[in-house]
């Protein structure tokens, strides 16, 4: 809709015109993106004299559509495959933020379920023993030994008493699938029992598919959540109006996360001074860190922020326009 208003536009094509709103403004593209058949989409672009491609979803960006379609005569708006890892791999993004001293939640990354469970249960055996709960301490120790040897069952094998204690032991955290999960791979946990359930759901049950081959266990931050989107050409940053989207499915911010239930902008939650802080301390350092690693970032850099009492901290980076944030932005 917005691109169709450009005075410089010749013809506008969309990869999917099954949406009636899109079909009203664009003609259908006969080829779709497939990482294993990139040549065919490139050839279609050549045949139709396409000189600008704007990529919306994160999956094609992570698969390298920008690298495949960019030519001397054709620009592609979006980051290259390597730069898109800032969204495609949450563990990569956390390490990038650590390198650049970008404020974010403390987190640990795990590539196997055994290490994740050991991290969650660390020290509980000694704690139970000091409280005189020798049987529970022995049960935890046995489970940890079995986890070490990869012979442990699921947490359903715990005694009823231990399951009850873990389900009531409040330690809020966030468990995230490291890969792309359409905005749904984040589980908010309030107890240690929920930590373990989330780990098994992601890494054992593969609730989010291959996105759960790695996961993050992250401290839970509290505050208002906002979205800051910026246009980047590799060096210059143009920060757009502040947005706020609402992800949880239920009224009053309850229930599991979705890709987005709705959004509005401009959100009156950060003043000009604080927006300057976000640009200087979050956006610029992220782009500079990638440049130091030999990666030039171009396209949209989206920072999902939590406005904590200690200031804005990064929840996630996305490598594309947010949906639904882009709708009120336009």
Task: Outline where the language-model segments fall.
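ATP-binding N-terminal substructure of ATP-dependent carboxylate-amine bond-forming enzymes
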Residues: 1-82, 87, 92, 135, ...
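General beta-strand structural signal in soluble alpha/beta enzymes
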Residues: 14-15, 54-55, 76-79, 97, ...
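Short, well-ordered alpha-helical microsegments
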Residues: 61-63, 116, 225-226
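Glycine-/Pro-rich loop/turn segments that contact NAD(P) or position catalytic residues
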Residues: 70-74, 81-126, 161-172, 186-189
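Acidic/polar active-site rim loop that often engages polyanionic ligands
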Residues: 74-77, 96-103, 177-185, 256-270
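Conserved ATP-binding module of the ATP-grasp superfamily
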Residues: 103-105, 127-175, 189-227, 284-294
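Short, intrinsically disordered, charge-balanced linker/junction segments flanking boundaries
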Residues: 105, 328-330
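Internal nucleotide-binding/catalytic subdomain
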Residues: 185-328
């Amino acid at each position: 809709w917005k691109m169709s208003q450009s005075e410089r536009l010749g013809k506008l094509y969309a990869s999917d015109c099954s949406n009636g709103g899109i079909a009203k403004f664009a003609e259908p593209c006969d080829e779709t993106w497939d990482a294993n058949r990139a040549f065919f989409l490139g050839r279609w672009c050549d045949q139709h004299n396409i000189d600008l491609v704007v990529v919306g979803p994160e999956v094609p960006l992570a698969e390298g559509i920008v690298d495949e379609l960019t030519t001397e005569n054709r620009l592609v708006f979006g980051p290259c495959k390597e730069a898109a890892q800032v969204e495609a791999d949450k563990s990569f993004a956390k390490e990038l933020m650590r390198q650049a001293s970008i404020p974010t939640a403390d987190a640990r990354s795990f590539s196997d379920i055994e290490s994740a469970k050991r991290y969650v249960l660390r020290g509980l055996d000694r704690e139970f023993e000091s409280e005189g709960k020798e049987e529970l301490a022995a049960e935890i120790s046995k489970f940890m030994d079995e986890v070490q040897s990869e012979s442990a069952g699921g947490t359903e094998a715990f005694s009823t008493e231990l399951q009850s204690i873990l389900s009531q032991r409040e330690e809020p955290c966030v468990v995230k699938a490291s890969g792309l999960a359409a905005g749904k791979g984040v589980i908010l946990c309030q107890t240690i029992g929920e930590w373990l359930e989330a780990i098994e759901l992601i890494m054992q049950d593969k609730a989010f598919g291959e996105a759960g081959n790695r996961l993050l266990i992250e401290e839970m931050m509290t505050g208002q959540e906002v979205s800051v989107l910026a246009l980047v050409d590799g060096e210059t940053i143009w920060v757009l109006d502040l947005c706020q989207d609402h992800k949880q499915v239920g009224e009053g911010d309850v229930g599991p996360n979705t890709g987005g239930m709705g959004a509005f902008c401009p959100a009156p939650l950060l003043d000009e001074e604080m927006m300057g802080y976000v640009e200087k301390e979050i956006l610029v350092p992220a782009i500079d860190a990638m440049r130091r690693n030999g990666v030039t970032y171009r396209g949209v850099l989206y920072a999902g922020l939590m406005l904590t009492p200690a200031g804005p901290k990064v929840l996630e980076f996305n490598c594309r326009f947010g949906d639904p944030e882009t709708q009120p932005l336009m």
